[in-house]
A protein has these predicted regions:
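Charged, glycine-rich intrinsically disordered N-terminal tails and low-complexity linkers that flank
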Residues: 1-97, 101, 109
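Mg2+/Mn2+-dependent nuclease catalytic core
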Residues: 85, 90-96, 100-179
């Protein structure tokens, strides 16, 4: 059994990317997530509070200086509660609007991976200040799914924009430590 990350970069449904690799033992995380989802389902206030205290996979590109939309110092201010609360913008609202549709489309294009279940927060087992929330985990193949729905950019086949790679690599780090 392999473990992998699937990235659904959706402007055009036909362009989805599947990255192979990863550790086969995800059952432990799925069980932890089931318990967490009872108290902190994704996008809930409890989920936001858990994530706020962590440097998350979504923050990785900013922390490394690779995010053209946010500077590392702004991330520091945000984590210290010294920045205005981000309430979304057109791009994030667009992504949230189409995320469920993208998940369903991904399942249709990759039936061999099974159903994609939403996933809550996973905390790094060795460094609890690190965490992340993949957009889903597949039922049959124990693959993580990260969905991106860009508004205006055309994405070529096999192309994952560089600024998404720190987020994906963070997920690799978290799940390679599962025992």
């Amino acid at each position: 059994m392999t473990f992998s990350v699937a990235i659904a970069l959706l402007k055009d449904w036909s362009r989805m990317h599947y990255i192979q690799g990863m550790h086969p033992n995800v059952a432990k995380w799925i069980e932890i997530d089931r318990r967490l989802n009872e108290t902190a389902p994704q996008k809930s206030e409890a989920w936001l509070k858990l994530r706020h205290g962590m440097l998350t996979a979504s923050d990785a590109a900013t922390a490394l200086g690779c995010n053209k939309y946010e500077k590392p110092f702004d991330l520091l201010l945000k984590k210290c509660n010294l920045a205005p609360k981000f309430t979304g913008n057109d791009a994030t609202r667009h992504g949230e609007k189409y995320e469920d549709e993208a998940r369903i489309k991904f399942e249709q294009i990759h039936p061999e991976l099974g159903k994609v279940w939403e996933f809550g927060v996973c905390q790094h087992p060795e460094y609890p200040f690190l965490g992340g929330s993949p957009d889903g985990v597949t039922e049959e193949s124990n693959s993580l799914v990260e969905i991106k729905c860009p508004m205006m950019r055309d994405i070529g086949d096999g192309e994952v924009p560089e600024h998404y790679m720190p987020q994906v690599n963070s997920f690799f780090s978290f799940f390679l430590f599962v025992s």
